[in-house]
């Protein structure tokens, strides 16, 4: 059986993640990891706070605190939020930890010793007023490719191009706005063209998603160039190269190594051997969940880094790169107060299952999608409550009232066949990371149940004295509910577990390999039935702006950033 390494892009802790960040990486990765466990697969699911680099220094300077003081608070705040969203990490760590820092330094020394690192003198912007070099986001200016006026010195947000500060037109200091002067400084470069030899051929024949292939191949066609891996800033991992005192490793290059160091950290904590078992097995299957702007770092740069170490690390098995989630037709913007952040969301609607399921239903898998409160309301009230919750409540209360909470019978063969077909489609979609499609198949199961119940009319059968037929109908409905609980588990884990217990099934719905029991006979018991979901109030859409403002006022007092 293959070993799966599920990696969610590491949230950068200069802010709290918004809904687009949540669905683009962390939540999608969690749904996939939960599915794999249910299929009995060997899985390790990791991520962590990305906390080094210039954006953190910029924010810390604004607040008059040390970078670590800032990231300590934000890391804990975000980690607790992910727990509230029921994210099932095996390890959610951070880049400023000894295991990661040591692993990064050791890895770059291997790359250096293998001849993939060279030095080159650069002319870099220097702020005479602040008396410092201006790497990455310490410099802002106009993008030379798309003309965006506020492009950062590491990447343009508008067009996604990777940049260096000298590329910017009309550069200025991010702190004081002064025009910089240019000074020479020595830096260490990763020979990306040399290290990436053979990776393009691998990419072309791989089964990576088309959007990943297309984005990467277009990026490669424009020409791979050596990339500077050191920076003239203090907050980061000290560069290990001889003569590189005072330099740090560029945050993008060290953060992607976190997928490896997070597994190594698990071994340090637990005395296990997971790093050898997962990362030293060439047949392991790393699957990365990222936003589309992070594609090159996962499709070319990370594989090139790992290849340059001389170790036989597995190449990406899949890169699930989502498009953008918009908010009511606009891009998320903290500055313009456009969007919903994940702490605000739970204040407006506290049930994490609602957010998990709704965001998966809106997941931007092939194109940008639009989060609207109207669509959220429809998904919660129509899909979760009417399709799933109403079917569950009808079945459970009927069995309790008319059969004393226990029923045995025969499962309808046509229903069995239909469920088996839906299960097969579901498994296929999930392995291909078509999470939105798979969530729709869960709804199809529930709708099948509602249709079957309405057509068979067990209440009529009982009136006509056909008790055995009525028992068969309700036993079949419990069979469908068991399937709904199993297949709902990755998306709405709390509701699935509650349903599992109400239909009297033993153990937990989240036990490893549980999905392999699809098609099994139900327990035929009903225990303490109650509504699985609660509908959002009828005036929710009228009041949501007011509710959101209340939520913002509340979380702004609690946020560390």
Swiss-Prot record:
GO terms for biological process: methionyl-tRNA aminoacylation. A motif ('HIGH' region) lies at residues 11-21. It is found in: Cytoplasm. SUPFAM superfamilies: Anticodon-binding domain of a subclass of class I aminoacyl-tRNA synthetases (SSF47323), Methionyl-tRNA synthetase (MetRS), Zn-domain (SSF57770), Nucleotidylyl transferase (SSF52374). Keywords: Aminoacyl-tRNA synthetase, ATP-binding, Cytoplasm, Ligase, Metal-binding, Nucleotide-binding, Protein biosynthesis, Zinc. It comes from the Archaea. Its EC number is 6.1.1.10. InterPro entries: Anticodon_Met (IPR041872), Met-tRNA_ligase_1 (IPR023458), Met-tRNA_synth (IPR014758), Methionyl/Leucyl_tRNA_Synth (IPR015413), MetRS_core (IPR033911), MetRS_Zn (IPR029038), Rossmann-like_a/b/a_fold (IPR014729), tRNAsynth_Ia_anticodon-bd (IPR009080). HAMAP family: Met_tRNA_synth_type1. Is required not only for elongation of protein synthesis but also for the initiation of all mRNA translation through initiator tRNA(fMet) aminoacylation. Belongs to the class-I aminoacyl-tRNA synthetase family. MetG type 1 subfamily. This is Methionine--tRNA ligase. It comes from Ignicoccus hospitalis (strain KIN4/I / DSM 18386 / JCM 14125).
């Amino acid at each position: 059986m293959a070993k799966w390494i599920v990696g969610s892009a590491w949230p950068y802790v200069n802010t709290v993640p918004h809904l687009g960040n949540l669905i683009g990486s962390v939540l999608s990765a969690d749904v996939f990891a939960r599915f794999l466990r249910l299929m009995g697969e060997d899985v390790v699911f990791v991520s962590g706070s990305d906390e080094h680099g210039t954006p953190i220094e910029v924010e810390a300077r604004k607040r008059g605190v040390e970078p670590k003081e800032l990231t300590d608070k934000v890391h804990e705040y975000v980690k607790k939020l992910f727990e509230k969203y029921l994210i099932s990490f095996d390890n959610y760590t951070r880049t400023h930890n000894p295991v990661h820092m040591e692993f990064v330094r050791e890895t770059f020394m291997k790359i250096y010793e293998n001849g993939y690192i060279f030095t080159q003198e650069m002319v870099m912007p220097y702020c005479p007023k602040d008396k410092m070099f201006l790497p990455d986001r310490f410099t802002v200016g106009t993008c030379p490719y798309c003309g965006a006026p506020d492009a950062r010195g590491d990447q343009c947000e508008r067009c996604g191009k990777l940049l260096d500060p000298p590329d910017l037109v009309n550069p200025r200091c991010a702190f004081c706005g002064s025009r910089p002067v240019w000074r020479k400084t020595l830096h260490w470069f990763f020979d990306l063209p040399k290290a990436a030899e053979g990776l393009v051929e691998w990419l072309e024949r791989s089964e990576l998603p088309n959007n990943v292939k297309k984005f990467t191949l277009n990026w490669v066609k424009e020409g791979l160039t050596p990339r500077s891996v050191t920076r003239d800033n203090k907050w980061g991992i000290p560069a290990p190269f001889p003569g590189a005192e005072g330099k740090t490793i560029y945050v993008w290059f060290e953060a992607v190594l976190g997928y490896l160091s997070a597994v190594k950290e698990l071994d340090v904590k637990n005395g296990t051997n997971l790093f050898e078992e997962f990362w030293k097995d060439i047949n392991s299957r790393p699957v990365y969940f990222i936003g589309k702007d992070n594609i090159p770092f996962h499709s070319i740069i990370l594989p090139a880094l790992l290849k340059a170490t001389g170790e036989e690390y597995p190449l990406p098995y899949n890169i699930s790169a989502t498009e953008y989630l918009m908010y009511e037709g606009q891009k998320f913007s903290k500055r313009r107060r456009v969007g919903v952040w994940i702490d605000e969301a739970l204040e407006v609607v506290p049930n994490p299952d609602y957010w998990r399921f709704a965001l998966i239903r809106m997941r931007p898998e092939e194109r940008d999608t639009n989060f609207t409160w109207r669509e959220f309301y429809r998904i919660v009230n129509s899909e979760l409550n009417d399709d799933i919750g109403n079917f569950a409540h009808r079945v459970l209360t009927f069995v309790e009232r008319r059969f004393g909470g226990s029923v045995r019978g025969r499962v309808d063969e046509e229903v069995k066949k239909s469920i088996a077909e839906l299960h097969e489609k579901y498994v296929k979609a999930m392995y291909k990371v078509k999470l939105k499609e798979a969530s729709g198949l869960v709804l199809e199961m529930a709708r099948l149940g509602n249709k079957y119940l309405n057509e068979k009319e067990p209440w009529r059968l009982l009136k006509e004295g056909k008790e055995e037929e009525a028992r068969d109908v309700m036993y079949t409905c419990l069979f469908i509910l068991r399937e709904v609980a199993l297949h709902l588990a990755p998306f709405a884990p709390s509701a699935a577990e509650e349903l599992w217990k109400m239909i009297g099934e033993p153990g937990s719905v989240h036990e490893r390999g549980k999905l392999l029991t699809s098609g099994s006979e139900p327990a035929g018991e009903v225990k303490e039935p109650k509504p699985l979901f609660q509908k959002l109030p009828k005036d929710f859409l009228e009041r949501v702006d007011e509710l959101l403002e209340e939520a913002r006022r509340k979380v702004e007092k609690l946020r560390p950033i």
